């Protein structure tokens, strides 16, 4: 299943307002999770980690928390995904929703359904880091959604250049700890800003 579900406070006009919006949504999400008798314990990166059966259940909880906060999903606050598909990949088939592995084409159709139903605005690592063709197919079939390469690029300039030529994504997650030096990281940032 999808590794992380995130919220983006699109309505915010300042950093402090963004923090306030996220705080309110997270507080409401915590209340909803408790009411459903699910655990409000958090994972390594600080997100809730309740035992739920599928991605849609997690997304439904987040949409409800946004609504309970007096906000509109897809307008005031958007849901973003970190799929971490390297962990869901077996021979270029993916288990995005269940233990069953499906083709790239079926995976793209699943992403389209999720995007439309939940107004998803950003998907990070939707396919495995070396499945360049899948990334390209997704970019060609999904518009107006940020497709973020993290594991795809690992803040590596050569991989970013390949991704640019392949039309693999329209965003990159840059992490200093992935490449090794500050100058290499800055080179990646400069190239990403140009393209």
Predicted ranges, named:
Residues 1-43:
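Mobile "lid/hinge" segments at catalytic clefts and subdomain interfaces of large enzymes
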Residues 6-8, 47-49, 171-175:
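Short glycine-rich or small-residue beta-strand-to-loop segments that form or flank ligand, phosphate
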Residues 8-21, 51, 95-105, 150-152:
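Active-site mouth loops of central-metabolism enzymes
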Residues 41, 51, 184:
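Short, electropositive, low-hydrophobicity segments enriched in small/polar residues
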Residues 41-46, 74-76:
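Short Gly/Ser/Thr- and Asp/Glu-enriched loop/turn motifs at secondary-structure junctions
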Residues 44-55, 124-126:
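Conserved short loop/turn motifs at secondary-structure junctions
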Residues 56-195:
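Catalytic core of soluble alpha/beta enzymes
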């Amino acid at each position: 299943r999808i590794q992380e579900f995130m919220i983006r406070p699109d309505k915010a006009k300042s950093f402090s307002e963004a923090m306030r919006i996220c705080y309110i949504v997270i507080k409401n999400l915590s209340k909803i999770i408790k009411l459903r008798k699910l655990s409000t314990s958090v994972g390594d990166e600080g997100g809730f980690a309740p035992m739920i059966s599928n991605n849609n259940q997690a997304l439904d909880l987040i949409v409800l928390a946004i609504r309970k906060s007096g906000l509109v999903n897809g307008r005031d606050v958007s849901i973003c995904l970190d799929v971490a598909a390297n962990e869901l990949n077996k021979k270029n088939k993916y288990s995005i929703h269940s233990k069953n592995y499906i083709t790239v084409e079926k995976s793209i159709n699943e992403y389209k359904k999720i995007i439309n139903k939940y107004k998803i605005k950003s998907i990070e690592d939707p396919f495995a880091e070396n499945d360049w063709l899948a990334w390209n197919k997704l970019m060609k079939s999904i518009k107006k959604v940020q497709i973020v390469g993290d594991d795809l690029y690992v803040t590596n300039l050569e991989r970013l250049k390949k991704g640019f030529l392949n039309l693999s994504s329209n965003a990159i997650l840059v992490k200093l700890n992935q490449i090794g030096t500050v100058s290499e990281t800055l080179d990646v940032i400069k190239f990403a800003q140009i393209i």
